[in-house]
């Protein structure tokens, strides 16, 4: 069975970079990233590995909602200047790169879903909880910095909703980290309570007459914003990748069933 290790490039690199005392020390960054990737390969023993990078284009989410991710700090200049050399070094280690046009998240999600649908296993290396919406038994998420898989049960308990409701929760309450707005006046706790009662957004919005006047008014006025927020939070899983899987095979890994990535 194919086991694809899919690394969220800047999620890994920027966290390692932040821990380096001298921000111009690209040699130290390269050594630490190389060590991290070597450890990932040793721990998970995948048949395939790729590291996915964000691109420079304006994402469709930003075009849809200009405030999306507004206020994010730009990449530090030394890192921006040294990134190509780091990517080349990883290529020399036989860790191939995939370059997204804009956000890496949709490419990672698409690759994971395609792998799972082809009866393979996908392991996403990232601390981004947004990948938790990929509800498939053949997809898991690994936090390299805490050396553990994402605990979905613990996340469900923390958020107060089931995994299948994660997107509905973000549609109602928003996501401050990504500047996804949600509905004004609806916080995470009240959103979770609403979803416990009504289970889904369609049922909730068709049942506003069962709520108090004040809350019903907030929801009615914010319905379109909830739809927008849902769309912003939802990962695309059907992008054309135009890659050849054999280019990402781990050296010395035995041949396995081919995944159609077209």
UniProtKB/Swiss-Prot annotation:
What does the note under cofactor report?
Answer: Binds 2 Mg(2+) per subunit. Only one magnesium ion has a direct interaction with the protein, the other interactions are indirect. Binds 1 K(+) per subunit. The potassium ion strongly increases the affinity for DNA.
Q: Which cysteines are joined by disulfide bonds?
A: none
Identify the residues that bind K(+).
Answer: 172-173, 181, 183, 186
Which residue ranges does the record annotate as region Interaction with DNA? 185-190
Q: Which residues bind Mg(2+)?
A: 105
Give the EC number(s) under which this enzyme is classified: 3.1.-.-
The record's Gene Ontology biological-process terms are: DNA replication, Okazaki fragment processing
As for family, the record states:
Belongs to the Xni family.
Q: What does this protein do?
A: Has flap endonuclease activity. During DNA replication, flap endonucleases cleave the 5'-overhanging flap structure that is generated by displacement synthesis when DNA polymerase encounters the 5'-end of a downstream Okazaki fragment.
List, alphabetically, the PANTHER family matched: 5'-3' EXONUCLEASE FAMILY PROTEIN, FLAP ENDONUCLEASE XNI
What's the protein here called? Flap endonuclease Xni
């Amino acid at each position: 069975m194919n086991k694809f290790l899919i690394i969220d490039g800047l999620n890994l690199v920027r966290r390692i970079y932040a821990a380096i005392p001298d921000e111009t020390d690209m040699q130290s960054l390269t050594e630490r990233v190389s060590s991290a990737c070597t450890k990932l390969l040793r721990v998970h023993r995948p048949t395939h590995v790729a590291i996915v990078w964000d691109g420079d284009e304006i994402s469709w989410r930003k075009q849809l909602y200009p405030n999306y991710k507004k206020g994010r700090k730009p990449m530090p200049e030394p890192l921006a200047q040294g990134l190509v050399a780091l990517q080349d070094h990883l290529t020399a280690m036989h860790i191939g790169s995939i370059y997204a046009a804009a956000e890496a998240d949709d490419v990672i999600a698409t690759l994971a879903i395609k792998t799972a649908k082809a009866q393979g296993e996908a392991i996403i290396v990232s601390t981004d909880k947004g990948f938790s919406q990929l509800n498939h038994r053949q997809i898991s998420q690994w936090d390299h910095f805490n050396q553990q898989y994402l605990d979905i049960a613990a996340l469900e308990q923390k958020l107060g909703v089931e995994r299948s409701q994660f997107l509905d929760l973000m549609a109602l309450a928003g996501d401050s980290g990504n500047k996804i707005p949600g509905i004004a006046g609806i916080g995470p706790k009240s959103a979770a309570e609403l979803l416990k009662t009504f289970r889904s957004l369609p049922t909730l919005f068709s049942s506003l007459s069962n709520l108090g006047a004040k809350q019903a008014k907030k929801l009615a006025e914010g319905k379109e914003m909830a739809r927008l927020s849902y769309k912003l939070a939802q990962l695309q899983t059907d992008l054309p990748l135009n890659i050849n899987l054999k280019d990402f095979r781990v050296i010395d890994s035995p041949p396995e069933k081919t995944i159609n990535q077209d």
